[in-house]
């Protein structure tokens, strides 16, 4: 099972929310009703909606995947641990497992392989939109998730997954593909990536689809 953090690098846009499936394990507040119906996915074209630049070095991604992918832990816990591993190897997490905002800002400027437009987009998504989401968490979703993930704190991984959704919503015109499917997903994500409650609704839909 690939992780959200790896999918950012491969631009597998329709699957960037998989790690956020974690929130459906918790009892959240009331979501936006629009988030209960998810657009369809064209598996042949799901990677072509947005050309996302490289966010993390391949050697870091590969090292963390190799370290955790073969473990017998549940897939979601492995996803959480792989993402946290990548962030730690890039020195983006403090000793208390919180994301280091100052280092994130420097990292984006120095390490993200993209245009200034992309760097501005990444900084806004991570620092202004997704980290505040984790800080607010009115339904205490994160604290409820911790018991399901061993010793892996979900907040850093969920921050990255949330940011990935924002990248696709706000993908620069030169890097985006216009198609009915891509436009529908961009509209959906623009409405449903703004609260943990909405993200919860998305993954309840995903789980219902898996059981059919």
Swiss-Prot record:
Q: Which family does it belong to?
A: Belongs to the PBP/GOBP family.
Question: One MF term from GO for this chain?
Answer: odorant binding
- What top-level branch of life does the organism fall under? Eukaryota
List, alphabetically, the InterPro entries matched: OBP47-like_dom, Odorant-binding_protein, PBP_GOBP_sf
Name the record gives this protein: General odorant-binding protein 66
The alphabetized UniProt keywords are:
Disulfide bond, Olfaction, Secreted, Sensory transduction, Signal, Transport
Detail the disulphide connectivity of this chain as listed in its UniProt entry. Answer: 64-85, 80-152, 130-162
User: Which cellular component appears as one GO term in the record?
Assistant: extracellular region
Q: Which organism is it from?
A: Anopheles gambiae
